[in-house]
Every structure is written in C-alpha cells, then in structure tokens.
C-alpha cells in the first residue's frame, strides 16, 4: 500500500496526507534567520506544545488556538516552506524524492526514525525555558539520510 508512489500530493486524501508526517518534530523547532545573509538556522528550542519524548503536538487539533503562528503544511504551501528540513516527507515528495528507509510508512513504526537519529526525541528544550535563541543553534535537524 505505497499510495505515495502512485499519487501526487494533490491527489492524496486527508488520512494519506497526515500519514506522510513522520512525527520527527523538526518543523516545530524555532528557527532563526540571519539578518545579513538570510541563512536559516535551526535551534533545539521546541514549540511549547511539542512533547520532547515523542515529537507529537500535545494539542494538535487545537494548536492554532494556542500558537496562532503555527504553520499548517498543505499541498498549496509546501513549495514555499523552504524551512522544512530535507528529511521531511512532504518536502521530499514535492521535490520528487522517495521516502527514506527509516520512515514509519516504510518500517511500520517510528522506532527506526528514532534509532536513525532523525527525530527530536530527547534532543530539545521547551522554548519557554530559553533566554537567548542564538545560544541554541544546532546542526542535527539538517541531517538527512536515505
């Protein structure tokens, strides 16, 4: 049942679209943009709604009520969301790439993703505990493996 191989992002139903999200949590990390170079930097400061143990939003359905600036990834905006990590399934499929070998749709569970180091599990701190975002810049969210 490899629906992502037979359908475009636009052809997917809501359940298929949502299942593409591996739950890595990288999109919920605070990001900084250098004013001079416009380079994007990830931090290990996670949204206050992100559970650091499993990478899930604790209020996913109502997240916009709690965090109005939260961005919903859609087929209409995925091309513009250049801050999505290269490992993101939405980004990968949009760019014509395959899902990685560790993706839950391939393996049947999220464990392979965690073992591969592709999630935020046990790597983040809550944004409410961060004083200076600049002190929390990290490179690991940029990692992308097949």
UniProtKB/Swiss-Prot annotation:
Pfam families: CxxCxxCC
Highest taxon above the source species: Bacteria
Family the UniProt entry places it in: Belongs to the UPF0260 family.
Record-given protein name: UPF0260 protein Ssed_2516
